[in-house]
Amino acid sequence: MASFIWVQLKKTSEVDLAKPLVKFIQQTYPSGGEEQAQYCRAAEELSKLRRSALGRPLDKHEGALETLLRYYDQICSIEPKFPFSENQICLTFTWKDAFDKGSLFGGSVKLALASLGYEKSCVLFNCAALASQIAAEQNLDNDEGLKTAAKQYQFASGAFLHIKDTVLSALSREPTVDISPDTVGTLSLIMLAQAQEVFFLKATRDKMKDAIIAKLANQAADYFGDAFKQCQYKDALPKYFYFQEVFPTLAAKQCIMQANAEYHQSILAKQQKKFGEEIARLQHAAELIKNVASRYDEYVNVKDFSDKINRALAAAKKDNDFIYHDRVPDLKDLDPIGKATLVKPTPVNVPISQKFTDLFEKMVPVSVQQSLAVFSQRKADLVNRSIAQMREATTLANGVLASLNLPAAIEDVSGDTVPQSILTKSTAVVEQGGIQTVDQLIKELPELLQRNREILEESLRLLDEEEATDNDLRAKFKDRWQRTPSNDLYKPLRAEGAKFRAVLDKAVQADGQVKERYQSHRDTIALLCKPEPELNAAIPSANPAKTMQGSEVVNVLKSLLSNLDEIKKEREGLENDLKSVNFDMTSKFLTALAQDGVINEEALSVTELDRIYGGLTTKVQESLKKQEGLLKNIQVSHQEFSKMKQSNSEASLREEVLKNLATAYDNFVELVANLKEGTKFYNELTEILVRFQNKCSDIVFARKTERDELLKDLQQSIAREPSAPSIPPPAYQSSPAGGHATAPTPAPRTMPPAKPQPPARPPPPVLPANRVPPAAAATAPAGVGTASAAPPQTPGSAPPPQAQGPPYPTYPGYPGYCQMPMPMGYNPYTYGQYNMPYPPVYHQSPGQAPYPGPQQPTYPFPQPPQQSYYPQQ
């Protein structure tokens, strides 16, 4: 029986999985937390698992296969949890073609891609290949070996079939030949056929009914036939099928399985007293086995089976001739043998390994992470919008009060002292550092801005340089430069960079507005920073208005202002409540993903935000409406208060100064808040830009690594290309052997007199007719013709050793010299004394018999003499 077919493993380059995964984990999860530390340890374990599965030779044992399967399950598990792509987590996986042996000038074909799908396909290929090797190593003389072999062949068939269905969608370009759909589809058929063969062997060993065995064998022959047909697509499949015994082995096994089917069906025919059918089937089986023995004897040994069939055939013929005299039907008249399949490709359902434990079990998928990020943004927008509304309302209220000089107007009834509200504001400004604080904050802004600009420009410069290099190489190698253009790959990063640049431009405008407002109120703010005596001296005095003290309108204004202060305090509490709300949407998103397969983030987020923030946003709106009513009442009461006040220029001037001081305080508070917020913004933006720079640096480094690998592969492929096209043979050598057309005789050429003639050399010895070399009887190789002018061959005479050449000198350096193409079997090392760079051509005088070549048993066809023969002058 023929040996079983197994598949070689693919080889890969080492990849550090831990570093990029740890970097992503550190950027995504809070630093210092147990969750981050746990995931970082898991990333290290994953990198070790890859080295264990792919970084060392594997034994042909199920334990080694278990390691491969665990790694495959793990990368399938992490695929939805990490954003593996060229512009996010960029991991370049390099794999060599399993069937390509390379060349003298370069290694085997390999492909490097930044695709986890590519890694999955290659790892699954190795799982299937190792399963085929394990099955081929089994002892098929016991049930355990048969069971293991059948199981592993069916798994290998299913794995190859899975690659066939998924490889094109997993890769962004054409795969190497070994994992192309045609190749893995054929391998799947081969593995399935061998699994069926194992069941046939099991049925034979258990001595099951011949009808069942015949059907199993016939189905196996069918599978082997399908695989044999697939292998005939030479351009689509690797050389593996033609140079490592697969192609002839498949052909032999198809015939052997068909012969087994006929043999066991003949036994069934004998049992049914159909002796003619028995003989016909045995004859067909004998023909099939004879064909195998004659064509594929090098690969299979069918002597025992052949003897078994021949004995059965001889006995059947003898019995039929002497006893039954049953007519032997033609093969085409026989009923077809049925088929019974007991095998099918094992589907690939993750996890495949029975011992798989997910290292990142608690990590949520990327889709959930993305939904959480969008939800966090929605939450931040809602909170910021509510807080902004309250702050704007407070600013509006302060502005209205400042324009009305309240509460200073109702406190300043004496007209010659600083109102208490102004003193309070002055004290607050001094405690916060006064104008020195504002000056220092404004001074720091340009430095922070410049730092962020430099980080952003450096990040974009890295992309520009790599893209320019990629464009240069693409222009140089044209279609050979097969990788994603940097211009397309960097579009998301450039869009992100443009967004950061726009943010910085807006920040510059905001900084300008803050500085402009500060300059317009700087003097008044400086006045608030002065001690009380200086402040009192700077405020004009007015006539006393003691009669207004305790009036009804003043009491109404005080009550309204007190209510407004209460609203402001409530807003501070609401703002803290809005900021302090904290809840996790992970469980809801995971539940939705498990139930529906997708996450409707918008619907879930809006519903949950309304539930949690609905009460707080209602209070915010009530606060805004209450303030609106209070401001209207304050303005009405202030009009009455203004009518009651004594009207003079000094009072008006004093009121104007007090208004400016109140406005200056409000602007100071707002300026300090804006400047601190701007400083915080720039510092946070620096962290974001540093991450952006790291992202750009990582992808540029990965692209450079990919570029170096691609350049190396291109250099090797260029080195493997022929340096010059092959020279076609002369016309007189391309004529068919044995043809009757007379080769045209070229015109005689005159040799220049200045050239010395070569010295005469003796002719080679002539061998007697009874010493014809054995190689002389070999058939001349294709493409070497025989001139029609040669004398006809007689039995026992030596054939001409070479086609007759032109009757002019062919020695290098002489006119008319033309180097002849080497024969396909030429090997200069078979010559003992001369290593000639071209095959010599014999010349003879008209009528002279050709010279036979010396005997060289190791040469597959007649050899010319080792010295050129020159015509005697």
UniProtKB/Swiss-Prot annotation:
Residues 176-508 are annotated as: Interaction with CHMP4A, CHMP4B and CHMP4C. The modification Phosphoserine is found at S486, S735. Residues 768-791 have a biased composition (Low complexity). Expressed in astrocytes and glioma cells. InterPro entries: ALIX_V_dom, BRO1_dom, BRO1_sf. It is found in: Cytoplasm, Cytosol; Melanosome; Cytoplasm, Cytoskeleton, Microtubule organizing center, Centrosome; Secreted, Extracellular exosome. GO terms for biological process: actomyosin contractile ring assembly; apoptotic process; bicellular tight junction assembly; extracellular exosome biogenesis; macroautophagy; maintenance of epithelial cell apical/basal polarity; midbody abscission; mitotic cytokinesis. Residues 423-873 are annotated as: Interaction with SDCBP. Residues 802-811 are annotated as: Interaction with CEP55. One of its GO terms (molecular function) is proteinase activated receptor binding. The modification N6-acetyllysine is found at K215. Residues 719-808, 837-873 are annotated as: Disordered. The modification Omega-N-methylarginine is found at R749. Residues 745-767, 792-808, 849-865 have a biased composition (Pro residues). Residues 3-397 form the BRO1 domain. Coiled coil: none annotated. Keywords: Acetylation, Apoptosis, Cell cycle, Cell division, Cell junction, Cytoplasm, Cytoskeleton, Methylation, Phosphoprotein, Protein transport, Secreted, Tight junction, Transport. GO terms for cellular component: actomyosin; bicellular tight junction; centrosome; cytosol; endoplasmic reticulum exit site; endosome; extracellular exosome; Flemming body. Residues 722-725 are annotated as: Interaction with TSG101. Pfam families: ALIX_LYPXL_bnd, BRO1. The modification N-acetylalanine is found at A2. Residues 508-873 are annotated as: Self-association. The modification Phosphothreonine is found at T484, T742, T745. May be phosphorylated on tyrosine residues by activated PDGFRB. Multifunctional protein involved in endocytosis, multivesicular body biogenesis, membrane repair, cytokinesis, apoptosis and maintenance of tight junction integrity. Class E VPS protein involved in concentration and sorting of cargo proteins of the multivesicular body (MVB) for incorporation into intralumenal vesicles (ILVs) that are generated by invagination and scission from the limiting membrane of the endosome. Binds to the phospholipid lysobisphosphatidic acid (LBPA) which is abundant in MVBs internal membranes. This is Programmed cell death 6-interacting protein. It comes from Rattus norvegicus (Rat). The lineage of its organism: Eukaryota, Metazoa, Chordata, Craniata, Vertebrata.
